Amino acid sequence: MMDWKRSFADTKVRDVYDLIVKEPSKVQRSAKIMDVIDQMLMNPTSRKVYVIDVEGNLIGVVNTEMILRLIGYRVGVKENSSMAFVHFLKDTLKEDVEDIMILKVRPVKRETPLTEALKSMIEFHVNDLPVVDDDHKLIGELMSSELFIAAKRLFESP
């Protein structure tokens, strides 16, 4: 009988990271928010658009939560508080990706153990991780769904 717990522990990011998302959504640093929305619409399984420089190096990320918040501000869906109004003033006029991208990105590499990627997802409350090569160029995206595929046998009845 196969030891699935051991099998999962031996799995690397390279074994699963492209099962669902074949090509990560990405834009250049100079892109507009509209470009991010277009990328999200073209790749609806992904919840992020990665920001890269001209060499393809990962420099940031824009997630769906940020875009939804900006949409909410533009259509008037907001909380009734002074902090919400401050956020509204701060965010509503933004048009450039550089203004909204998150700089703290925690990438993994193809050789990263899947257990390490899982630990990062849990610790940093993220569902997806960018996959980069040794030169920090974006080559893929590891989605939580891909971890589910690899771990599903852990929950099967004996």
Predicted feature locations:
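Tandem CBS (Cystathionine beta-synthase) repeat/Bateman regulatory domains
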Residues: 1-158
